Amino acid sequence: QTIVKDANATAITVNASGDKSSLDLTGSAEAKSLNITGDAALTLKASDLTKLTTIDGSAATGDLTLGTLNAATVNVNTGSGDDTFTIAATAKVAVDAGAGDDTVTLGAVIAAGSHISLGAGNDTLLIGTGTIAASTSDATTIIDGGDGFDTVSAALINAANAAQFHNFEALDLTAAVSNLDVALMTNSTLEALTLSGNNGAATVSNVAAGVNLLVSGENSAATTINVKDAAIGTADAFSVAFNGTGDNSAHSANVVVNGIENLSVESAGMGSSIANTLTVTDGALQNLTITGDKALTLDFKSGTGAAEHGMTIDGSAATGALTIDTTNLITITDPAGLTVKTGSADDTITLNQKATVDAGAGDDTIIASAKGGTFTGGVGNDTFDVSLALAGNADPANALISTVTDFSAGDTLKMITAGNTFTEVTLTEAVHDLASALTLAATTENITVWFQYGGDTYIVANDGTGGFGAGDLAVKLTGTGYNFDGATLSNGELHL
């Protein structure tokens, strides 16, 4: 770092050349103007220059990192690089950030009549501790995002100043926001909402159809997004896309999107070993689609789903590992029930109700609820945990039976612990239906048996009391082509 001190200079010119520069102007107490030129990246410290009113870096082509400016600095122009600075002035300011992907933070309450132009590029206007005063009859405030995909912090916007924001395409919801009506932003056409950090809860309303949520930060606070007319619609859609960066990074969102029937999630990002997490609250949810190549942990808040409609969670196109927990989904009464599909990675699915599951490729784990279901593991060494799916009724005619469609070598079937004996039972002439077959199979306590009936294979684990009971467990394996000669049973886990 180069330190320059001139106690008498009123104007300073810096030519940034070479690869990059770091300059400290501490002690140049009389400086009122600073001109920056050159093509090198420059990091500048000038925060203690209490008389510095103007910074003109419009001729600079390198990235300018100016830090927090002094409260006296009210005129700032930067050039074509990716520039970063924080405004600390409370008076009227004039800012032109030029071209480049610039980031400007407001660290103070700027006065009415201020003009901020972010210029060309994908720019961001963030809130620090500052706000923007509304226009008055003789002082018009204009905040212009300019060309490009520009983002503004929602915490800077209120009913009084919303129309002053021009040409912004994205609204950042990271900082706490209380029920902002985005329809008030009449001079901007929003294309996206963003979560870039981890500061607090936010609520926005009147979000237009087609606007999505981009998640690059880690925010566990609730982000409530009220899409316009979703409460009365029957086929409303919303999408969440993770686009965070950094190896071994974590990105998360907790979204409330009540009224949305169709939710799509893209679990993506730039970097290796990225882990994304999404929590969903949506009382109308019927279809949730997952794509992307990054790991995603998905869960739900209580009350999500509509009992009178079936629900499908379709992650079959995803190549990142999916961890899906349906514990808090509403119990679906529609005959279509709950369907879960996952993709080609090693996925884990935890169920709270009867479900149909196709786990795709990968070494997957399916954890059934007490209501059982029909489960397909797909290619890979899969684990089917049906230990909670007990018969539930001492009458075998009314017993719960879960189905595994593709149990094969390398897979694990986890049942109740019923001793380590696994043997075939031969059906007698007394067996005339499935109920009587189950009765015969459960005669002896603390053993697990298998038999074939009606073109399928059944496994029955007795709970320790002779005779079929509610605590026994029955599983149907689709088809009869199973070779149990080398099968092992230990602590309720059956391995082929």
Language-model segments: which ranges?
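Solvent-exposed, low-complexity segments and loops of surface/extracellular structural proteins
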Residues: Q1-L496
